């Protein structure tokens, strides 16, 4: 059989050489193995007769046919002599032109051109069996038709809808509708498993369906339209196709053998087959190839083929240019590398330059030499070992980079380098007072720290935790402390931190390992005694990488941080001189072991007069200058600031107050610009709002030297006596509440901006703009009227008040008592209301509403029990609690409430209802009560006192255990209040219901 194949190849050398390449177009362009497999598989007779291209290598078509017949006879004779292949040889085979009905085979990817092989896979076993049977019956032909896409779909997009069934699942008419009418009569040359190898013969057109499964159709054989072989246009087009194919051959050697065969024997080829060849070997879209297959006009077919091969040539050139560019880049890099290596070698021989390792070692030794006297011995030993190791490593190894980075960190740290501290208490007092108003507890603690350092001659690291609500200046005061002590400042936030490695560092074995935050801090500040601010320590996270709070235990323990061990450095670091300042909003969220290591300084927030001072002297001035407004152009009166504080900004801090003042001045700036004002800039600085300053809201109350109007304050520290006198001068502001009418100071006659003048809607209309432009032209030389903001027009700038009056009753009715509560925004008043729901013998009960927590519900139950006992003692004949169902309610039902401090207030409310007596006017109370009537201490004394003053309360009842907390308050907070400290509820009873019994008053 191999001899037969060789004989056929000798007769048709070009046909056997080019045929495998045609099949390669359809699949992965490597079908030679399949064809050779077919030759070895016993299909020599059929393959030998049909494995050829559609043009002969002899002179004419008749001679080619005679030569082909001889080759077929030789192959057949050889096959008959072979016993293994005798069953596959059929003496008489149906001629192609006699095939009028064929089995339709769908081609999903590309059409089959006459003269080309194509392997396909048939999954339908019934169809495969029919093909095998036809071969046995000497009908080795089938129709190959390209599958067309469904109507309305983009052929370039693959869909996965239900209607887009697999072509193997379609039968009968459904399959016929998906096939192109024009296809190719294909000879089945080989069937191996589910693989069928087809050889294209001639064009077909479907006329009708004969059988549904397998799909069998009647066909008409199509012939090319007559054409003149000597037509110059056809010749020129064919020559252009051949020339383009040669260009493709130059750009890509993929089809080298097949293109060379065609171009060398172009006189032996007819034009239609040349067009088919060009389309078949191109990588064009399957629908463009189908157009070539359907075209029967030879000239048009050549034109279509020329377009396809031109595109193929452009793609080949593009591929060639890309490959050339990559090759040039690679060769250039190699050449550059070689020259650099040669240059290094020459410089090294001449002694002009050392290698990288020597230069690195010299740099590291130079760094550590300056710190050698202060650097610990164990650190010097590690550095020497690593330098020796560095010399032994290759520069290209990964371990070299790890060692280099490790040495870089070791040598850059400030071993034994401390900044000179300033132990001047008066200097520190001045700086703290300049930067912050109030916060006396924090300032006093810092001054104590400085005083101890002055007496000892040195200072030790401390761990201070500033706790308080947002916006009170916790973060910014850390920077002020560093400035007062002349220490470097470093801040990092641990809010949401869940990875221990952020604090302790990564092991050096990990790729991209880095030291922890403390080592990075020391490198950044360059000293070993900085002030480190650990922000949001109450918001530490916890994840799979460990517990950062536990990692901070070593860092914040004065007994352990002397030898703090970072995982990356793996050498002890002395952090005992570092002053740690932590900030937190809620200390209850800090783990107890960590909380035990810190000294807590609570910042309760600012009272009204402190906010007034900050707003008037700090925020208002800074914001006005930041907006480019001059003092003579706008003014915010004290009455407006007071209304702003009490009706818009009741939170403990001043961040929201700062935002509201900025809002006012932005609107004033817009008004002035619309009036034609254009201030010349006084300094080369961009106008930004105060909230965009680097320190954010916490720095809003920071008083800078350049913004102080009084020169005397720039050179003198404010002493405690001065502070007290200044606070006393502002006591009149505290006596004014939201409920009272606030009368602003008499404003100048320049003019107060009215509501109509402020209407931005009117200003934004075209008529308003024209009016302003006209007014500007008429009064260009006139002075712009001063904008004055007071309580009457404040709402035009900041909107309606956020907070309403907390005091609901001027005189509380029967069953209603005012209590005092603590919230995250500071203190507030809280009314307790009780009423009788039902009355009858033995119907005594208690109903509670107001979204109360479990602790508060228990307090109400205790209050009900204690109230019954007290009523029985005071009025034995009164059976109110035994026969009445009481409903207790706490207003603001949408707000969750909890805590035990309302116990005494609940008892008083129930007793007021039971006795039918209202409590004393302007009375507020707070305190936890026990079943025996004892009053236990509560928290938030300062906040609750401020809330009572804000609601014009004159008499307050506190537990006796809180007397010390109250005594520590500033005099201006306590002034004007009648405060009673009680141990038992009987004392409260006497106060609330105007008994003659008097308790200790402040």
Curated annotation (Swiss-Prot):
<dbReference type="InterPro" id="IPR046336">
    <property type="entry name" value="Lon_prtase_N_sf"/>
</dbReference>
<dbReference type="GO" id="GO:0043565">
    <property type="term" value="F:sequence-specific DNA binding"/>
</dbReference>
<dbReference type="InterPro" id="IPR054594">
    <property type="entry name" value="Lon_lid"/>
</dbReference>
<dbReference type="InterPro" id="IPR027417">
    <property type="entry name" value="P-loop_NTPase"/>
</dbReference>
<dbReference type="Pfam" id="PF05362">
    <property type="entry name" value="Lon_C"/>
</dbReference>
<feature type="active site">
    <location>
        <position position="944"/>
    </location>
</feature>
<comment type="similarity">
    <text>Belongs to the peptidase S16 family.</text>
</comment>
<dbReference type="InterPro" id="IPR003959">
    <property type="entry name" value="ATPase_AAA_core"/>
</dbReference>
<dbReference type="GO" id="GO:0004252">
    <property type="term" value="F:serine-type endopeptidase activity"/>
</dbReference>
<feature type="domain" description="Lon proteolytic">
    <location>
        <begin position="811"/>
        <end position="995"/>
    </location>
</feature>
<dbReference type="GO" id="GO:0034599">
    <property type="term" value="P:cellular response to oxidative stress"/>
</dbReference>
<keyword id="KW-0378">Hydrolase</keyword>
<keyword id="KW-0067">ATP-binding</keyword>
<dbReference type="Pfam" id="PF22667">
    <property type="entry name" value="Lon_lid"/>
</dbReference>
<keyword id="KW-0720">Serine protease</keyword>
<dbReference type="InterPro" id="IPR020568">
    <property type="entry name" value="Ribosomal_Su5_D2-typ_SF"/>
</dbReference>
<feature type="active site">
    <location>
        <position position="901"/>
    </location>
</feature>
<dbReference type="GO" id="GO:0004176">
    <property type="term" value="F:ATP-dependent peptidase activity"/>
</dbReference>
<dbReference type="InterPro" id="IPR014721">
    <property type="entry name" value="Ribsml_uS5_D2-typ_fold_subgr"/>
</dbReference>
<dbReference type="InterPro" id="IPR003593">
    <property type="entry name" value="AAA+_ATPase"/>
</dbReference>
<comment type="function">
    <text>ATP-dependent serine protease that mediates the selective degradation of misfolded, unassembled or oxidatively damaged polypeptides as well as certain short-lived regulatory proteins in the mitochondrial matrix. May also have a chaperone function in the assembly of inner membrane protein complexes. Participates in the regulation of mitochondrial gene expression and in the maintenance of the integrity of the mitochondrial genome. Binds to mitochondrial DNA in a site-specific manner.</text>
</comment>
<dbReference type="InterPro" id="IPR008269">
    <property type="entry name" value="Lon_proteolytic"/>
</dbReference>
<keyword id="KW-0547">Nucleotide-binding</keyword>
<dbReference type="GO" id="GO:0003697">
    <property type="term" value="F:single-stranded DNA binding"/>
</dbReference>
<dbReference type="InterPro" id="IPR008268">
    <property type="entry name" value="Peptidase_S16_AS"/>
</dbReference>
<comment type="subunit">
    <text>Homohexamer or homoheptamer. Organized in a ring with a central cavity.</text>
</comment>
<keyword id="KW-0238">DNA-binding</keyword>
<dbReference type="GO" id="GO:0016887">
    <property type="term" value="F:ATP hydrolysis activity"/>
</dbReference>
<keyword id="KW-0496">Mitochondrion</keyword>
<dbReference type="GO" id="GO:0005759">
    <property type="term" value="C:mitochondrial matrix"/>
</dbReference>
<dbReference type="GO" id="GO:0007005">
    <property type="term" value="P:mitochondrion organization"/>
</dbReference>
<dbReference type="GO" id="GO:0005524">
    <property type="term" value="F:ATP binding"/>
</dbReference>
<feature type="domain" description="Lon N-terminal">
    <location>
        <begin position="102"/>
        <end position="313"/>
    </location>
</feature>
<dbReference type="Pfam" id="PF00004">
    <property type="entry name" value="AAA"/>
</dbReference>
<keyword id="KW-0645">Protease</keyword>
<protein>
    <recommendedName>
        <fullName>Lon protease homolog, mitochondrial</fullName>
        <ecNumber>3.4.21.53</ecNumber>
    </recommendedName>
</protein>
<dbReference type="GO" id="GO:0006515">
    <property type="term" value="P:protein quality control for misfolded or incompletely synthesized proteins"/>
</dbReference>
<feature type="binding site">
    <location>
        <begin position="468"/>
        <end position="475"/>
    </location>
    <ligand>
        <name>ATP</name>
    </ligand>
</feature>
<dbReference type="InterPro" id="IPR003111">
    <property type="entry name" value="Lon_prtase_N"/>
</dbReference>
<dbReference type="InterPro" id="IPR015947">
    <property type="entry name" value="PUA-like_sf"/>
</dbReference>
<dbReference type="InterPro" id="IPR004815">
    <property type="entry name" value="Lon_bac/euk-typ"/>
</dbReference>
<dbReference type="GO" id="GO:0070407">
    <property type="term" value="P:oxidation-dependent protein catabolic process"/>
</dbReference>
């Amino acid at each position: 059989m191999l001899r037969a194949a060789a004989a056929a190849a000798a007769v048709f050398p070009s046909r056997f050489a080019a045929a495998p390449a045609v099949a390669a177009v359809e699949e992965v362009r490597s079908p030679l193995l399949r064809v050779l497999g077919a030759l070895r598989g016993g299909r020599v007779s059929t393959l030998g007769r049909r494995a050829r291209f559609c043009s002969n290598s002899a002179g004419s078509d008749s001679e080619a046919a005679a030569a082909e017949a001889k080759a077929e006879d030789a192959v057949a004779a050889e096959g008959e002599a072979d016993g293994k292949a005798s069953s596959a040889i059929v003496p008489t085979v149906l001629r192609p032109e006699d095939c009028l009905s064929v089995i339709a085979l769908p081609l999903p990817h590309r059409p089959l051109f006459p003269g080309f092989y194509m392997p396909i896979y048939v999954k339908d076993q019934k169809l495969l069996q029919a093909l095998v049977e036809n071969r046995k019956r000497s009908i080795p032909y089938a129709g190959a038709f390209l599958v067309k896409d469904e109507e309305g779909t983009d052929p370039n997009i693959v869909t996965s809808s239900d209607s887009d069934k697999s072509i193997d699942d379609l039968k009968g008419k459904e399959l016929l509708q998906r096939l192109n009418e024009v296809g190719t009569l294909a000879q089945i040359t080989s069937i191996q498993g589910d693989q069928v190898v087809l050889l294209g013969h001639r064009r077909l057109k479907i006329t009708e369906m004969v059988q549904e499964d397998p799909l069998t159709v009647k066909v008409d054989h199509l012939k090319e339209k007559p054409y003149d072989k000597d037509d110059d246009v056809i010749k020129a087009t064919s020559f252009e196709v051949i020339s383009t194919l040669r260009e493709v051959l130059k750009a890509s050697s993929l089809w080298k053998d097949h293109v060379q065969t065609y171009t060398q024997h172009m006189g032996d080829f007819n034009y239609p087959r040349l067009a088919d060849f060009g389309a078949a070997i191109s990588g064009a879209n399957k629908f463009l190839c189908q157009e070539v297959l359907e075209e029967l006009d030879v000239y048009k077919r050549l034109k279509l083929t020329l377009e396809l091969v031109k595109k193929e040539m452009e793609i080949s050139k593009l591929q060639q240019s890309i490959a050339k560019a990559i090759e040039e880049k690679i060769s250039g890099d190699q050449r550059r590398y070689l020259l650099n290596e040669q240059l290094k070698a020459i410089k090294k021989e001449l002694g002009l330059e050392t290698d990288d390792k020597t230069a690195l070692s010299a740099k590291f030794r130079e760094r550590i030499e300056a710190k050698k006297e202060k650097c610990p011995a164990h650190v010097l030993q590690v550095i020497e070992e690593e330098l020796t190791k560095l010399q032994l490593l290759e520069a290209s190894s990964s371990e070299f980079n790890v060692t280099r980075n490790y040495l870089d960190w070791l040598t850059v740290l400030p071993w034994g380098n401390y900044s000179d501290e300033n132990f001047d208490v008066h200097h520190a007092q001045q700086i703290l007072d300049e930067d912050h108003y109030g916060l006396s507890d924090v300032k006093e603690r810092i001054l104590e720290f400085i005083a101890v350092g002055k007496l000892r001659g040195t200072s030790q690291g401390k761990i201070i935790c500033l706790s308080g609500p947002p916006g009170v200046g916790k973060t910014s005061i850390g920077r002020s402390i560093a400035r007062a002590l002349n220490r470097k400042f470093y801040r990092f936030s641990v809010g949401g931190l869940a990875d221990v490695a952020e604090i302790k560092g990564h092991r050096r074995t990990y790729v991209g390992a880095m030291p922890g935050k403390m080592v990075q801090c020391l490198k950044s500040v360059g000293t070993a005694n900085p002030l480190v601010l650990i922000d949001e320590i109450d918001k530490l996270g916890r994840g799979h990488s460990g517990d950062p709070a536990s990692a901070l235990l070593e860092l914040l323990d004065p007994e352990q941080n002397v030898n703090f061990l970072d995982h990356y450095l793996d050498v002890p670091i002395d952090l005992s001189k570092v002053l740690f300042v932590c900030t937190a909003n809620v200390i209850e969220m800090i783990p107890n072991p960590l909380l035990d290591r810190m000294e807590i300084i609570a910042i309760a927030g600012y009272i009204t007069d402190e906010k007034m001072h900050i707003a008037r002297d700090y925020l208002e001035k800074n914001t006005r200058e930041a907006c480019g407004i001059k003092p003579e152009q706008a003014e915010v009166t004290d009455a407006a600031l007071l209304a702003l504080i009490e009706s818009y900004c009741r939170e403990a801090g001043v961040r929201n107050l700062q935002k509201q003042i900025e809002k006012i001045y932005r609107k004033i700036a817009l008004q002035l610009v619309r009036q034609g004002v254009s201030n010349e800039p006084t300094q080369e600085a961009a106008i930004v709002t105060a909230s965009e300053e680097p320190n954010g809201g916490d720095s809003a109350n920071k008083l800078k030297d350049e913004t102080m109007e009084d020169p005397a304050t720039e050179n003198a520290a404010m002493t405690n006596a001065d502070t007290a006198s200044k606070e006393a001068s502002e006591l009149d502001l505290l006596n004014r509440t939201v409920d009272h009418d606030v009368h602003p100071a008499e404003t100048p006659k320049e003019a107060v901006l009215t509501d109509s003048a402020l209407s931005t809607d009117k200003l934004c209309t075209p008529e308003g703009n024209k009016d302003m432009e006209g007014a500007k032209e008429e009064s260009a030389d006139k002075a712009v009227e001063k904008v004055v903001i007071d309580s009457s027009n404040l709402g035009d700038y900041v909107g309606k008040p956020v907070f309403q009056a907390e005091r609901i009753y001027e005189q509380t009715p029967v069953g209603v008592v005012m209590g005092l509560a603590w919230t995250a925004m500071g203190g507030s008043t809280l009314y307790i209301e009780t009423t009788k729901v039902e009355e009858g013998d033995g119907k005594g009960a208690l109903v509670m509403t107001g979204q109360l927590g479990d602790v508060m519900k228990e307090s109400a139950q205790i209050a009900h029990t204690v109230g019954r006992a007290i009523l029985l003692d005071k009025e034995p004949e009164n059976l109110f609690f035994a026969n009445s169902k009481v409903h207790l309610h706490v207003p603001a039902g949408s707000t969750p409430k909890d805590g035990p401090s309302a116990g005494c207030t609940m008892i008083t409310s129930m007793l007021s209802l039971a006795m039918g007596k209202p409590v004393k006017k302007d009375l507020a109370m707070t305190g936890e009560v026990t079943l025996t009537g004892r009053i236990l201490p509560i928290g938030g004394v300062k906040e609750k006192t401020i809330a009572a003053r804000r609601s014009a309360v004159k008499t307050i009842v506190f537990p006796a255990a809180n007397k010390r907390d109250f005594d520590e308050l500033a005099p201006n907070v306590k002034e004007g209040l009648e405060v009673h400290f009680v141990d038992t509820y009987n004392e409260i009873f006497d106060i609330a219901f105007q008994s003659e019994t008097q308790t200790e008053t402040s």
